Amino acid sequence: LFAEGAEMAHTVLDSVALGYQPVWSRARQLSAVRLAVHVLHPESVDAEHLWRAIGSDWPAAAPTLILAPDTPELIDQALREPPLRNTWLEVPHAWFEAPEGLAQLVEASSKGHQLLRAADLSAVRSEVITPLDVRSLLQLNPNDAWLALRQRNSVELTLSRALLSGQIYAGVASHQLACVCLDEAGAWGLLGWPDEDVLHSHRDRQPQCSNAVIDQIRVGMVAECSIEQLERLVRQDPVLVYRLLALVNSSAYGLQHEIQSLRHALMMLGFTSLARWLREQQAASRVTTSATGAASERGTEDDLHPVRYAMVMRSRLAQHLLESGAEDNLRAEVYLTALFAQLDRLLHEPLGGLIQKLPLSERACDAVLRASGPYHRLLDVARAQGDPPKLSALPAVCDRHEIGLEHANRSLLRMLATSRDYAPTTIAPA
């Protein structure tokens, strides 16, 4: 059921290691994805064939793809190629400072390339005019972070001197700094999200189902969507998926047979019972909100969304790593396995206790609790592709699990091309 590595001469997609990192907007939605390209075999890699493998017509509805090659040779070739739709090309700051490099960037920009300058904030903070008026991906160091947080409440200094508006920031390690960048300094987005600090700041609050996802589900139900569409909506929220499966398998529900799949659970519930249960989840959320203050609801909901959706992206990648001919029920099981493997982070409970409440298959339990079995290798490769700083280790991870590097790279591209973050919808309470 799993793709084998190709035993042939190197092709462009088994000569690079691709990794991804989401960019989150001020609304805490997925606005772009940085695709790191780590070149393994330079003699087999050129921009023309790599661009062709990525696809000349990157979907407009997909998140903007930030192409980030890690060698000067590949960047040089990429600048000479026609631009790909809905993509940006990341170029190191040094290219903008050298006359020859700047001339090449001017020409590439005139041909339609959207350039993203990668620089340290400390190196460009004092510049008056940005070369070519490009957006920048700015790396924060600890001193930058300290300065931004210090100036936030200073009457003598302004925040604009610490951070530049309209840019993408990387290296944001705290929840407070993320809020400063997005809400006060006017950042375009954040590369990555301070998951652990955000989760730590919400550790004393009872985790709730996402109201935004519930609203989307209710819209779909009003429109009489198919069971397949309903399943896609529900599985956007790991907490909602877990609680729904726990509900239908509880003694209170009284079913004689265990329900392992989300689709089966939705069919057993039916629209009427599901709608009633969703109203109960939102009511519980409102009770929690009234106890903590209305102002905290939006912050909790929005700031947790990047954590939840990153889990969804990794689960979808694990699913795509299956062979194209795999059955739907197998794909669904792999998705749930990957989703539940990270559930303890959201629910602040030991993973073993959470999983015991669900009738998961032995393969799923092996992957989640023991890091073993056939599903574990899918989860492990998906994890490695979501860790760009360690992309050099991806070939070894793929070899260990007998998954071809080319297949892993294609799976990642398919996952990203079909990623759609939901737009929050407001519905009058039922």
Task: Report each predicted region and the residues it spans.
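Conserved alpha-helical "signature site"
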Residues: A62, W146-A430
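Generic structural signal for short, solvent-exposed loop/turn connectors between secondary structure elements
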Residues: H41-L50, A119-R125, L140, V222-E224, ...
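Bacterial c-di-GMP phosphodiesterase EAL domain
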Residues: G5-W88, W95-P99, Q104, P306, ...
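Short, solvent-exposed coil/turn linker segments
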Residues: P22, A68-D70, P83, P92-A94, ...
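Short, low-complexity N-terminal regulatory "tails/caps" that precede and couple sensory modules
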Residues: L1-M8, A430
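The catalytic core of metal-dependent phosphodiesterases that act on cyclic dinucleotides
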Residues: E81-E196, E333
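Generic preference for hydrophobic/aromatic residues in regular secondary structure cores
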Residues: S15-Y20, V33-V37, T64-L65, R85-T87, ...
